[in-house]
Amino acid sequence: MKTAHWADFYAEKIKKEKGPKNIYTVASGITPSGTVHIGNFREVISVDLVARALKDSGSQVRFIYSWDNYDVFRKVPKNMPEQELLTTYLRQAITRVPDTRGYKTSYARANEIEFEKYLPIVGINPEFIDQSKKYTNSTYASQIKFALNHKKELAEALNEYRTSKLEENWYPISIFCTKCNRDTTTVNNYDNHYSVKYSCECGNQESLDIRTTWAIKLPWRIDWPMRWKYEKVDFEPAGKDHHSSGGSFDTSKNIVKIFQGSPPVTFQYDFISIKGRGGKISSSLGDVISLKDVLEIYTPEVTRFLFAATKPNTEFSISFDLDVIKIYEDYDRFERIYYGVEDIKEEKKRSFKRIYELSQPYMPSKRIPYQIGFRHLSVICQIFENNINKILNYLKNVQDDQKDKLINKIKCVINWIKDFAPEDFKFLLRSKFDNIEILKEDNKKAISELLDSLKKNFEVATEQDIQNEIYKISRENNIEPALFFKQIYKILIDKEKGPKLAGFIKIIGIDRFEKIVSKYI
């Protein structure tokens, strides 16, 4: 039977290729050399979705996330303060670089904490592994010794995909100088036991004991497969750059065999682009969009939905423009289908319901959450000037267990209007009348008639009733309906167009409508 979701397909593939196990290990990781961006998040959530699928099939899962923070600091990101100071730390381990923003003890840790803080919000709770601690505590001493003792085999595996072969005096390690802390070093000798001699460009020369030193690490293309073996990794995806022909994954799947392990099940995930960014995000973070930024516009459920509803090898854009409205509409439809409020063909229903399940940070609620369209909610938010209590008071039949998610959605709507909505989407209900336009008598008469008509049965009138009345009165007064609509918008929000007028008036309420239009008649 065809699986309901791509995550279920890979869960089955893992169990088939790795065989029955008490626990399956799935892995992800990143070098925290800058703000951990939403492209990095695609790997994390891809692993989480497969982990969920494994758990749903009855398997135990260990989800590890490696902070590759013992990598070299190669380049100063443009969005970091004190560029000159940071430049002095180039070629040192990232964990030694100070946090020039003043948040944490190190630059790397500041980037890590920012990401760790927001992962639980979207239901992701991996076991974090600090690779700098692993190396500085000599945890990998036996693996480093193994690599040195198998230098020839490792060189052959690396040379298979290199245009220029490694030199005879190459060693499968890199060393941070204990004097200047940089990796500007050359390995001079290994005694085939535990002693390694090196020299540094700064002039320092010394011998190190593999069992006790903090200064030796394996280079990336050896470190990665070594950890597959060490952590017993069964699944780890990678980006298209790693999966390119002759890329790091091709090399690593051969090197892991030298370490007497096997490569994990994998897949290639594609890149993410950003559509409609600007304003706050652009000015504060340059070209970097973080999970925090996305969660300001998308609820945790919709954030997960963006990835759960898209195959990992598909490139897609995260939108901050008007497409946000469509994305929320799509999610709401999946929600209605999941709870049986809306029906579709049976062959699609299973897939839709599974996507909705995997979009939830934790368990789906027992009943359907309070549904209100993003566009409609954006009108309500602006009418009530983003006052959440007033918005909740206006909305009917919101149950206590529905409030938290609804409030979160309201906050996302408010953020989107403030930072990304086009200007013609924004409005402010008129509250000052010191510079109002004087209406012609026939327009005054029509507006007065509309007010009187609406006051008679406003509570029971539908949006269609109000719409019909606007057209009726415009025709009776020989006013072109389009011009009459413009006049009403101008009175209410000082613009010639705005939200759908009948619904807009219904939300405003007859008292506020009368208070505004009475100033003109």
From Swiss-Prot:
Localization annotation: Cytoplasm
Family recorded in the similarity comment: Belongs to the class-I aminoacyl-tRNA synthetase family.
Pfam families, alphabetized: tRNA-synt_1f
Source organism phylogeny: Bacteria, Pseudomonadati, Spirochaetota, Spirochaetia, Spirochaetales
Keywords for the protein's UniProt record, in alphabetical order: Aminoacyl-tRNA synthetase, ATP-binding, Cytoplasm, Ligase, Nucleotide-binding, Protein biosynthesis
Motif residue range(s): 'KMSKS' region: 280-284
PROSITE patterns referenced in this protein's UniProt entry, alphabetically: AA_TRNA_LIGASE_I
Name of the featured protein: Lysine--tRNA ligase
InterPro entries per the UniProt record, alphabetical: aa-tRNA-synth_I_codon-bd_sub2, aa-tRNA-synth_I_CS, aa_tRNA-synth_I_cd-bd_sf, Lys-tRNA-ligase, Lys-tRNA-ligase_SC_fold, Rossmann-like_a/b/a_fold
EC number: 6.1.1.6
Gene3D superfamilies: 1.10.10.350, 1.10.10.770, HUPs (3.40.50.620), Lysine tRNA ligase, stem contact fold domain (6.10.20.10)
Top-level division of the source organism's lineage: Bacteria
Natural source organism: Borrelia garinii subsp. bavariensis (strain ATCC BAA-2496 / DSM 23469 / PBi) (Borreliella bavariensis)
Gene giving rise to this polypeptide: lysS
Molecular-function GO terms, alphabetical: ATP binding; lysine-tRNA ligase activity; tRNA binding
GO CC, one annotated term: cytoplasm
Example GO biological process: lysyl-tRNA aminoacylation
